[in-house]
């Protein structure tokens, strides 16, 4: 589970790489649209917080060659990210920073912070702390965007986030029904 810290799975027999690559495949269809929806100016500094396989980071790097793109994620995830970036020939365009989302410096200041599909992995207090840390990493006038799974108010629909929410809530106290998923703001 991608929760800001190394998974407790340990020597997982390839599970983490399979998970990260699966997330990359899932994000690939949206990445270019997201990069166009949040255009960058030359020289802008971007933080992809919990960037996983760097799918969105690569889309920004390709679409906006003058931008400085950073992916912050856990060391185990970034082992996979490095492989993916080499495969795409993008390792020189994306800077990688390893750490614990809640403890280690995020760097910055950044002009844009992208937070995609990580908030559901946190219990409410940690989720709020992470959002505050992201806000603190922004330059004056900086902006942030969050992409996340959401449940309707009854917390049972739509089906995909509903099925997803149960396991996440059991693991980290998060889940798609967490107040961090749609009910808080930077």
Regions found by a protein language model. Give the residues of each.
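Alpha-helical subdomain
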Residues: 45, 49-186
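Conserved Class I S-adenosyl-L-methionine-dependent methyltransferase catalytic core
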Residues: 1-44
């Amino acid at each position: 589970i991608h929760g800001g810290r190394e998974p407790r799975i340990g020597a997982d027999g390839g599970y983490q790489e399979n998970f990260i690559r699966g997330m990359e495949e899932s994000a690939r269809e949206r990445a270019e649209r997201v990069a166009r929806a949040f255009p960058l100016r030359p020289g802008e500094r971007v933080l992809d917080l919990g960037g996983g396989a760097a799918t969105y980071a690569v889309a920004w790097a390709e679409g906006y060659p003058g931008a400085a793109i950073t992916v912050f994620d856990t060391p185990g995830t970034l082992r996979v990210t490095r492989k993916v970036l080499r495969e795409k020939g993008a390792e020189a365009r994306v800077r990688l920073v390893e750490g614990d989302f809640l403890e280690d410096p995020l760097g910055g200041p950044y002009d844009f912070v992208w937070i995609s599909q990580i908030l559901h992995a946190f219990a409410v207090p940690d989720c709020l702390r992470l959002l505050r840390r992201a806000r603190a990493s922004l330059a004056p006038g900086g902006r942030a965007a969050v992409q996340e799974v959401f449940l309707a108010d009854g917390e049972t629909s739509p089906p995909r986030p509903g099925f997803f929410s149960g396991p996440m809530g059991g693991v980290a106290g998060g889940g798609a029904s967490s107040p961090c998923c749609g009910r808080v703001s930077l």
